[in-house]
Amino acid sequence: FWCVLVVVTILLTWKNKRLPLVGLCLIAATSSFWQEFFGDWGAYVAWNPAFAKLPFWGEMPFTTPVKPLFIPFSWGWWFAVSIPLLVTLVSWLGQKFPKLSTNWLSLLIAFPLFLAYQIYVEGSSVANGWWTYDVVIGPALQTEKGRLPLIFPALLGLWAAYFVAKLAKRDTDGFWPHEVKMGIAAKPAGWRRELARIWAMIVLFQVSFFIFNIGSAMLGRALFGGPSLLVP
């Protein structure tokens, strides 16, 4: 499916002479996969060692020991699908209900949808033994094969609300606020501007995702966590 999205991105870019949101999210999310393993360390996530592993990244301090090969691709396709859909929905509702702010619409829509999906997927994955949380802090879902803390899906939902709110706002020329602030809107149309848009999306995605999800998990473990046999 990741490859299909690459083809879709190429075709849409060729047609419109402009990178679509799907493609920007695909590139930004795929390039951000490395954050997964630092966040897993903070959240005490232990992956099933039966998964095929990344060939170039073994054990490393402050990361979970098992690093599945599919993570870059799963990050890419999931965010390339979910974020544009939510942005489209929030933008459409914003036109229907102009008195409601984009931030509130995003919080009311993106947060609960992302939260519900994460709880469902992670809960079923933990139940299937794909991964588990060796140490759990706060309320959690309990299964025969593992536990799922609820704080991390909630943080991801908050990030989604923030990120969608940022992307649901465009100026009359179709540029997002972060592109305007970075001076991209002033650049002439062409591949140089599109390359700048890629880097801008990567920065927005990686910085915001790290602050909301990865840094908070790592800081929480460093301050309040304890030892772990599965995720030392």
Language model features by range: what are they?
Residues 1-232:
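Aromatic-rich, lipid-facing transmembrane alpha helices and their immediate juxtamembrane interface loops
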